[in-house]
From Swiss-Prot:
Gene3D superfamilies: 3.30.1390.10. Disulfide bonds: none annotated. Belongs to the ClpS family. Binds to the N-terminal domain of the chaperone ClpA. NCBIfam families: PRK00033.1-4. It comes from the Bacteria. Involved in the modulation of the specificity of the ClpAP-mediated ATP-dependent protein degradation. This is ATP-dependent Clp protease adapter protein ClpS. InterPro entries: ClpS, ClpS_core, Ribosomal_bL12_C/ClpS-like. Residues 1-20 are annotated as: Disordered. GO terms for biological process: protein catabolic process; proteolysis.
Length: 104
């Protein structure tokens, strides 16, 4: 919240001057991508997605898996760089193909 500082105008009335508000720059966001996987079963991919990214519902995990299956790549989640790297590396450690890229 900006601080207000009273000042006197020439007519004697007090005028409140607001200090400029600070705008926080939003940190860049990254997309975690799942690439099509011809090796693992659809059930394994969905289960792994839900284990690694707890925010995903069963329906979300299925949608990501089907998007990757049908188009070659599915969007798992958009988040800050640290969790994006964690999710990507954890998916890879479980045998899935994943990458991250900056959000547009």
């Amino acid at each position: 919240m900006a601080e207000e500082t009273p000042t006197r105008s020439p007519g004697g009335a007090a005028v409140l001057d607001k200090a400029p508000e600070r705008v926080r720059k939003r940190s860049p966001r990254y997309k975690v991508l799942l690439h099509n996987d011809p090796v693992n079963s659809m059930e394994y991919v969905m289960t792994t997605l839900r284990q690694v990214v707890p925010q995903l519902s069963e329906q979300d995990a299925m949608a990501v898996m089907l998007e990757a299956h049908n188009t070659g790549v599915g969007l798992v989640i958009v988040c800050d760089i640290e969790p994006a790297e964690f999710y990507c590396e954890t998916l890879k450690s479980k045998g899935l193909t994943s990458s991250i890229e900056p959000e547009d």
